[in-house]
Amino acid sequence: MINRFLIALSFLTVLPLKFKEINEKELIRSIIFFPFIGFLEGVFCIFLVNIFKQIFSSSVISIILLVFLFSVRGIFHIDGLSDTFDALFYKGTGQKEKDLQQRLQIMKDSVIGVAGAVALVLDVLCRFAFVKELIDINQFLIFLFMFCFSRWIVIPLMYYGKPARTTGLGVLFIGKISSWQVIISTVLPIFLLVYFTIEKNFIFLPLIALFLFFISYILKKFFERKFNGITGDHLGATVEITEIVFLICFLLGEKLWLSY
């Protein structure tokens, strides 16, 4: 079990870890720890906020958190976001099969396009602004749920989705995980959802979670229509999109709740 946790930690981060054994079977089983990895990211972000909030402004702390996340995650998710947007903004020839193959080829290209660059800039700007706002209103504890949920949201995509390629990281997971893995991985997000809803009085949080689940379903259908399946890049893009949409919805919900 510890070995699977370390595999998940190594897969989702840039930490150079060693394991007793790593193979495709163990890698697939490690996905039950994805939400917990997100939870740990939240813990460290909260720790950093508490350390620096008496020293720096919320703007500086927001930048520190972005640097921390980039240092831990590397380009794993943002690369998927940029590749996905580059492929989506390919104009196409009108020939379905040819356009499909071209989009998949664009995602494999190491050169970033204009659409991908714009997506990255918007992602960073949104994170900076929304994280700063969370710190300003002293609601940064929600990082625990946000990062946990964004890691979990790709697991249903893996379970219900089909791979767009026969090669790549996505093939290792998509369509290959079991229902019990989905159930086990859901325990921590549900616990945090109940905790923040009841103990912190975030009564709008379940609605946000349902909305994000709906968004992930829409993304799944969209990816399958445009790419005839899901790739690892799409999973990474989904994590990024989920976190941005969550921040928007949470801040909006908090403002409306306080005004009410």
From Swiss-Prot:
| Pathway membership | Cofactor biosynthesis; adenosylcobalamin biosynthesis; adenosylcobalamin from cob(II)yrinate a,c-diamide: step 7/7
Q: Which reaction does it catalyse?
A: alpha-ribazole + adenosylcob(III)inamide-GDP = adenosylcob(III)alamin + GMP + H(+); alpha-ribazole 5'-phosphate + adenosylcob(III)inamide-GDP = adenosylcob(III)alamin 5'-phosphate + GMP + H(+)
GO terms classed as biological process: cobalamin biosynthetic process
EC annotation?
A: 2.7.8.26
Instruction: Please provide one cellular component term from the Gene Ontology annotations of this protein.
Output: plasma membrane
Give the main EC class.
transferase
Q: Which InterPro entries match?
A: CobS
**Transmembrane segment boundaries:** 31-51, 55-75, 111-131, 140-160, 177-197, 202-222, 234-254
Which Pfam family, any one, appears in the UniProt record? CobS
Q: Which family does it belong to?
A: Belongs to the CobS family.
Q: Which HAMAP family match?
A: CobS
Q: What is this protein called?
A: Adenosylcobinamide-GDP ribazoletransferase
Q: Which organism is it from?
A: Thermodesulfovibrio yellowstonii (strain ATCC 51303 / DSM 11347 / YP87)
What is the name of the gene encoding this protein? cobS
